[in-house]
Amino acid sequence: FVSKIKGVFDDERKQLKKLDKIAQEIISLEDKYSALSDEELANQTNVLKEKLNSGSELDDILVDAFAVAREAAWRQIHLKAFKVQLMGGIALHNGDIAEMKTGEGKTLTSIFPVYLNALTGKGVHVITVNDYLAERDARNNGKVLEFLGLTVGLNKRELTPQQKQEAHGCDVTYTTNAELGFDYLRDNMVTSMEDKVLVKGLNYALIDEVDSILIDESRTPLIISGGKKNTAALYLQADRFVKSLKADEDYEVDIESKTVALTAQGITKAEKGFKISNLYDPQHTSLVHHI
């Protein structure tokens, strides 16, 4: 057992060492790209795309792509990525989860794998937990990506189908997990391919607050239905129930991500209050949404 645990840590050290080496290569190109004019730097996107068209893989152009994005971020939003942020970006490109503390530059880190994967032209989705974060990141990181010649879209609930097609048709699309999920469900209900909003399909996604989205948020199913006639009564019942809850004991509020979730104690209270055995049974989805 001890040897297995030791092996896990050894593998992690090897992985970090590999990421460190690649990050150093990226930093070593700083002088090369800082010497370019804005026009020459932006044109590197075309240079990198041509390499992909000539048969190169994304991993082959990673170092140059990250170095280009690093210089562009410095010029456009005055943030210089350090080694730890580059390492995080490489890990995200590899499909791994990168855990970073508050203040370590998670938003800046996301630019690098997003830019690299957008070079394929197949589309990239950046998924966040709420509209505020999606709009903020689209606005701030969008300055860097648009400077480099990429198109950036923001997917919101109030958009028309045509506007959603335009947003999803961009090189990079910022969206919430719920809105992307509903777009996917609606696309599977259309009778004509022309009505689909995910015009590029799903290629590469970068998920912010991945633990919240893939674990916490996944407890609430995304269901499209016609709704029930007793929805008003359910609102009143849910309202009375919520007023009986105690903060921190029955529910927790995450100020940073602007989300609220029932605790285990709160879930038990709900099941007793509404006389059900499992709050997160699909048949109680409407109740969960009302709460």
PLM region spans:
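Conserved P-loop NTPase motor core
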Residues: 1-291
